[in-house]
Design a protein with these regions (language model features):
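Alpha-helical heptad-repeat coiled-coil segments that mediate oligomerization/polymerization in large
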Residues: 168, 172, 213, 220, ...
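Peripheral, non-transmembrane regulatory/ligand-interaction domains of membrane transport proteins
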Residues: 1-210, 219, 223-226, 301, ...
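Hydrophobic alpha-helical transmembrane segments and their immediately adjacent juxtamembrane loops
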Residues: 225-326
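Hydrophobic alpha-helical segments, principally membrane-spanning helices and signal/leader peptides
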Residues: 18, 57-58, 86, 175, ...
C-alpha cells in the first residue's frame, strides 16, 4: 500500500496510485509510506526519489553502516520494530530514506502501532513536522516510548515469575521454559534498543538534520540509555531466578537420592545378617537353637536372626535421627 502525506493542509492520500507521483515534486510531499508495496509502487517511488529502496536482506544486515549511512543525495537508516505476537513479539525490519530536500520514505512489511501513533501526531500538529527529518525523529520517539512499555512489560513478567517460584513447592520444566523465553525476549529487546542508540548517535554527529532536532536527540539518547539499563537489570534478575530454580531442582533431586540412600543403609545390616545366616555351612549352631514349651518347639535361631535384623535397623534409624539426617 502506498500512502502519501502532502505538505499542503496536512493532506493524506491513502492507497495512492503510483502515477500520482509523476505530478508531484519534492516541495509537495513530506512522507511516503510503503506497506508491503507492489513492484509497481516500489518502482514508482524509486523513480521519484532517484534512489533504490533497500532490500530485506540489506535491512537485516547487522553492520553499523547498514543501520545508518549518509549518501550524497540522501540518508538511509534501517532499524527493527517489534510486532506483538500473542504473549510474545517478533522483530520486523523497517527501512527509511530521507532525501536532501527533506522527503521521508519508509518501507515496511507489517502494520505497526508506531506508524499509527506518528500519523496521529502529524495530523494533530502538522506544523511541527515541517520536513521528513522531523517525521523520522517523531517515529523514533514513538518507537522509544513503545520500547519503554515493552521493557516494563518484561519486568512485570519477571517479577511474576519470581513470585511464582517463591510460592510453588516444586519446580517443573514449564518454569525453565518461561525463564528461557523471557531471557530470549529481553535479549532481543536490548539488542534492538541498542540498535536505536547507535542510530541516534549517528544522527547527533550528522550536520544534515535541522538544528531544532538536536535538543530532542539528547533527551532521546538519555531515554534509550535508561531503557538499556532496565533491560540489563531484567536480564540479570532472570539469571538469578534461573540459578535459584536450578538450585531448587537440585535440592529436590538430592532429597530423592537421600531417601533411597537412607533406605539402602537402613536395610544394609539386616541384609548382611540375612546373608550370613543364609550361607550353606554344616556348622551353624544358631540354626539349631530351639525351645520346647508345652510340647511345642520354638525355633530360637530364627527368632534370634529376625530380632537381630530389627535391632540393627532400629539402631541405624535412631542414629540417623540423632544426627538429624532424617
Amino acid at each position: 500500500m502506498l500512502t502519501i502525506y502532502l505538505k499542503q493542509y496536512n493532506k493524506i492520500i491513502r492507497n495512492a496510485e503510483p502515477e500520482l507521483l509523476d505530478n508531484l515534486g519534492y516541495d509537495d510531499i513530506q512522507w511516503i509510506d510503503l506497506l508491503s508495496p507492489t513492484i509497481k509502487e516500489q518502482k514508482a517511488v524509486e523513480a521519484f526519489m532517484e534512489e533504490s529502496l533497500q532490500t530485506r536482506q540489506q535491512v537485516e544486515e547487522i553492520e553499523s553502516t547498514s543501520k545508518y549511512s549518509e549518501r550524497e543525495n540522501s540518508i538511509i537508516s534501517n532499524t527493527n520494530f517489534f510486532v506483538p505476537r500473542g504473549d510474545s513479539f517478533s522483530v520486523e525490519p523497517v527501512s527509511f530514506i530521507i532525501s536532501n530536500e527533506g522527503v521521508l520514505v519508509s518501507l515496511r512489511n507489517e502494520e505497526s502501532r508506531t506508524f499509527r501513533e506518528a500519523e496521529k501526531r502529524l495530523q494533530m500538529n502538522y506544523r511541527s513536522f515541517s520536513t521528513g527529518y522531523h517525521i523520522f525523529i517523531s517515529l523514533l520517539e514513538v518507537r522509544i516510548d513503545f520500547d519503554a512499555d515493552l521493557v516494563e512489560f518484561v519486568a512485570k513478567q519477571v517479577a511474576t515469575l519470581s513470585k511464582d517460584i517463591n510460592t510453588e513447592d516444586t519446580i517443573d520444566k514449564d518454569v525453565i521454559h518461561r525463564i528461557n523465553s523471557l531471557q530470549e525476549n529481553t535479549m532481543v529487546l536490548r539488542e534492538n534498543i541498542f540498535d536505536r542508540q547507535r542510530i541516534l548517535s549517528n544522527i547527533l554527529r550528522s550536520e544534515r538534520f535541522p538544528n531544532d532536532i538536536y535538543p530532542r536527540l539528547q533527551l532521546m539518547i538519555k531515554d534509550v540509555n535508561s531503557l538499556i539499563n532496565h533491560a540489563d537489570f531484567s536480564f540479570q534478575r532472570l539469571d538469578y531466578i534461573q540459578d535459584s530454580a536450578l538450585g531448587l531442582i537440585n535440592i529436590e533431586q538430592n532429597e530423592i537420592v537421600k531417601i533411597f540412600s537412607v533406605a539402602a543403609v537402613i536395610f544394609l545390616p539386616a541384609t548382611l545378617i540375612a546373608s550370613v545366616y543364609g550361607m550353606n555351612f554344616d556348622v551353624m549352631p544358631e540354626l539349631s537353637w530351639t525351645w520346647c514349651v508345652g510340647g511345642y518347639t520354638i525355633p530360637l535361631g530364627y527368632l534370634f536372626a529376625i530380632g537381630l535384623m530389627i535391632l540393627c535397623s532400629g539402631l541405624t534409624i535412631w542414629f540417623f535421627r540423632y544426627k538429624k539426617w532424617l
